[in-house]
Amino acid sequence: MNKLVNLTVLTSVAVLSACATMHKDSAAHLAVVEKITINAPAAKVWAKVADYGDLGAFHPAVAKTEIKSGTNNLKGAVRLLTLGDGGTVNETLTSYDAAGMSYSYIINESVLPVSHYSAKIDVNAISANVTEVVWNADFARKDSSATPAKGQDDAAATGTIHAVFKGGLDNLKKITE
């Protein structure tokens, strides 16, 4: 009986230790949602957002967008964003719905402090001349250690994505109203 109890205790300790180690080295699941209401028809707003191969059409931080492989606006297209500061972001289009005015993408490589990043942008008609744009993302911070480097923690990751989305959406409103 004692051998069985000891074996059970040892097994439990081993499982708990393994779980603690796995948790220690994994970053939390993070999410960001930004929305903006624009006083313009949805078709006009979508016309600025629709071209996966030209994020700079509405996002002021993007100096250049290049389709590196695949076909623009088709699932699997890979784009390379060059930011104003010279940093780059490599992304893959995972879905595109022109009729539904939305697309989704993932980040493959980036200067941003995020990993396992997937995002979606939706343009929704509220009325004939009012549109809501919703940009959301799920991700983890790039530094998955228990003690991330300065500027690589959860707050930095979510703050960066909030700023990216807000900068793009604010400019989209400015150029379409």
Task: State where each predicted segment sits.
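Bacterial N-terminal signal peptides that target proteins for export
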Residues: 1-9
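Bacterial N-terminal signal peptides
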Residues: 8-17
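Hydrophobic ligand-binding cavity/cleft-lining segments
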Residues: 19-71
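A conserved amphipathic terminal alpha-helix motif
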Residues: 20-21, 132, 138-177
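Hydrophobic/aromatic beta-strand elements that line small-molecule binding cavities or substrate pockets
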Residues: 34-36, 89-95, 117-125
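Soluble non-cytosolic domains of exported or imported proteins
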Residues: 36-43, 49, 53, 113-114, ...
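A mature extracytoplasmic/lumenal domain signature
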Residues: 49-51, 59, 85, 95-97, ...
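Glycine-rich portal/gate segments that line the openings of hydrophobic small-molecule binding cavities
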Residues: 66-113, 132, 167-177
